Regions:
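Short pre-active-site segment immediately N-terminal to the catalytic Zn-binding motif
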Residues: 318-324, 375-395
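Catalytic zinc-binding patch centered on the HExxH motif and its immediate surroundings
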Residues: 317-322, 355-377
């Protein structure tokens, strides 16, 4: 791991220039053209793949084909991550949108290669498949990947229909996702601050002020802004879900959860058990919300109260705000308390400018971690507004980055892991931060604040995410009968929130239009971007408890689990 110095400041802007040439330059255009030509050539080769069986030159031909697949997929990962980073940091930039669209237009070629690969693997007999895989070190090293792709073929339309669907998706389902990115990226929220009306990006809006009037002002200003694009977002949501349902119907899938579970390498029984246990036991969180309401002087909390600081949770004379430099340092220190390897990694990522955290207008909402396969690096995006919740977000995203770092020397095809296991690494990092802070806290004010944040996280993963799941599930059920207007979508959201939160919030304190503001519903390539968070949270909580019993050997065992996420199904991996 590259050395870093203790005196290096943690800058708030990431370094993208060392990864690829700027998208506006000729060098980037040359790389993009080379990628396009490479895909075209590989797509043609994929039409003539030999049988996946021993004998003749089949093994040599397959290794050569898969190595070229590997090279181009690594480049695809880099290009997509690179332009995604630029677009997130400068949401209004039309050039970045054009490059995103250009990359999306190449997806049918990737899909053609993938389809031909999976059909060839599917057509191989079990004995031939095993014999050829075992005969070559490269194939044997990627046996899990090949088996997964073989399994994927069962969820494919006939070849011609599959390729047509991929072509149509560029200006169909994925275009609706890009439309949402543009609408939300252009959105500005007008709020009153110190007697002046100022415009902010959604990611700059905070609900953690100790003054309820400020939280209300921010909430209603945000609600008004999001409502202005609700009808367009309803169109996007309807067509994203409608496209999926059409595909599922053509595939003969009776349950719209089959595909999300397949993508997470997870059994339906695991999902059902998880929600069943949570539903039975989250009454304790209802008690927490009621206690917090009493401490805030409210009969029940409103949506905008859930992140409010508790009275007395701030030590007299101290500010509840935490500057980025201090927050980043806190993450490094707490990570180091778990393992030197994790701490050194976080320090390296921060000092080498892997993180974009500046609080400024013009950025997209949300936070993410994305990887650059050829560079063996990651980049983290967020907007740091000087809150302890932001520190948790930073830890969360660096947990993702550490996961990729641990896998960086594995075969590229075994560096891909499902979202539920991805969220295990990120939420484990949050747990390390929170538990270490709690252990080190000295005053009752500090302990109270940390416990409040930990319980608020539990509400987020076990109630808020549950509401998203219930909403998306019922939305898909109703969407099967036709499109839903924005008003009906909001009704579904309200019902899901009340059920998931056990009606713990005030009657006028819900957020029916939450579906408009939540990016996760509009990610066209990942349906049900919700339950994996809860799975990861529960698993990471259990892992942290085990770490307290296992002693000094646990960090290495944890690394072993992260490696297993790229080459195993979910249940066996854990």
């Amino acid at each position: 791991m590259p050395a870093t110095t203790a005196t290096t400041p943690y800058g708030q802007n990431w370094d993208l220039d060392s990864l690829l040439p700027h998208p506006a330059g000729e060098e980037f255009t040359k790389i993009l053209d080379g990628y396009r030509h490479g895909l075209q050539g590989l797509a043609e080769r994929s039409d003539k793949l030999p049988a996946f069986s021993p004998g003749g030159d089949q093994g040599t031909a397959w290794v050569a084909f898969l190595r070229e697949c590997e090279r181009l997929e690594m480049l695809a990962t880099d290009l997509s991550a690179f332009i995604g980073c630029h677009a997130a940091a400068d949401a209004a930039n039309k050039l970045y949108r054009q490059v995103e669209a250009a990359l999306s237009a190449l997806d049918p070629l990737r899909e053609k290669i993938s389809t031909n690969l999976e059909f060839a693997l599917r057509d191989a007999g079990e004995a031939d498949f095993k014999s050829l895989v075992d005969a070559d070190p490269f194939l044997k090293g990627n046996a899990f990947f090949l088996s997964q792709r073989r399994k994927n073929a069962r969820l494919r339309l006939p070849r011609g229909e599959e390729l047509l669907a991929a072509d149509l998706a560029v200006d169909g389902i994925h275009a609706w996702g890009r439309l949402y990115d543009r609408l939300s990226g252009d959105l500005r929220i007008k709020v009153m601050e110190k007697g002046k009306l100022v415009e902010k990006s959604p990611g700059q809006i905070r609900f953690d002020s100790p003054e309820r009037s400020v939280r209300q002002n921010n909430f209603y200003a945000g609600e008004k802004a999001w409502k202005s694009i609700a009808d367009s977002c309803a169109d996007a949501l309807n067509h994203i879900a409608g496209t999926r349902l059409t595909m599922y119907r053509r595939l003969g899938l009776a349950d719209h959860l089959d595909m999300p579970l397949h993508k997470n390498r997870m059994n339906r029984a695991t999902l059902d058990t998880m929600w069943s246990v949570i539903t039975r036991r989250k009454g304790v969180l209802q008690k927490y919300l009621a206690a917090k309401a009493r401490m805030l002087g409210q009969e029940k909390l409103a949506w905008y109260d859930t992140q409010a600081p508790l009275p007395g949770a701030e030590e007299p004379g101290q500010s509840a705000e935490i500057p980025y430099e201090s927050g980043a340092g806190l993450v490094v220190r707490t990570f180091s308390s778990f393992s030197q390897d994790l701490g050194d990694f976080a320090k390296m990522a921060l000092t080498q400018r892997w993180v974009e955290a500046e609080n400024r207008s013009g950025k997209r909402q949300g936070a993410f971690c994305t990887g650059f396969a050829t560079k063996k690096q990651s980049r983290v995006f967020m907007t740091f507004t000087n809150t302890h919740d932001n520190v948790s977000t930073l830890a969360h995203e660096l947990g993702h980055a550490y996961h990729s770092w641990v896998l960086k020397d594995q075969p590229f095809f075994l560096q891909d892991y499902p979202m539920n296991l991805a969220e295990t690494a990120s939420t484990f990092a949050e747990a390390v931060l929170a538990e270490q802070r709690l252990a080190e806290s000295k005053s009752r004010w500090e302990k109270l604040s940390i416990l409040d944040h930990m319980l608020a996280d539990a509400v987020a993963y076990l109630m808020n995410i549950h509401a998203r799941f219930l909403f998306e599930n019922r939305f898909h059920e109703e969407r099967a009968a036709g499109e839903l207007p924005a008003e009906r979508i909001s009704e579904l959201m309200l019902a899901a929130q009340k059920e998931a939160y056990l009606s713990s919030l005030a009657d006028d304190g819900w957020y029916p239009d939450f579906w408009v503001s939540k990016l996760h519903f509009y990610i066209s390539g990942l349906p049900f971007y919700n339950f994996p968070y809860t799975f990861g949270y529960l698993l990471s909580t259990g892992l942290y408890a085990l770490s307290q019993q296992a002693g000094k050997d646990f960090p290495e065992q944890y690394r072993g689990l992260l490696v297993a996420t790229g080459c195993m199904e979910t249940e066996p991996a854990v």
